[in-house]
Amino acid sequence: MMAALPLVLIAAVADNGVIGDDNRLIWRLKTDLRRFRSLTLGRPVVMGRKTYLSIGKPLPGRETIVLTRDPAFRPEGVRTAADLDAALSLARQVGAAMGADSVTVAGGADVYRQVLPLADRLELTFVHARPAGDALFPEWDRSAFIADAPENHPAGPDDEHAFTFATFRRRA
């Protein structure tokens, strides 16, 4: 039997833990959006219903799987699942069929909270700002992960805040 595809959680988190406000992103970071695209392209992407609605459409070149408790929620071009186990099972099946090397998870806060204990890798963007917001990244145990060297980026024309890309791999 083939090993399960690794589970990769992807998030942008402000210095104060905020990840969004009123169901939307609260910063403009084109460099981070390009990284998100490269991390998810050709892979299944699991997200909650509110996150999907904030994006408003399926992500091109990816298989979008939306977690929802509403059986009537069936947007065109995405798959839905009623709970995390079903979503991850579907994502792993779809990922294996499409030749993906991982399953990615793109939020929101409640989905992150459920996935953190299961994630093999975290791909985090630490946004160096302290915005107001109503969605927070959950507390997590950094000692359970090994950090790769961080990649710092200054604010610039395409990025309204300085930020750091950081990869964390779960300890064996």
Predicted segments with their positions:
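Enzymes that bind and transform nitrogen-containing heteroaromatic metabolites
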Residues: 2-172
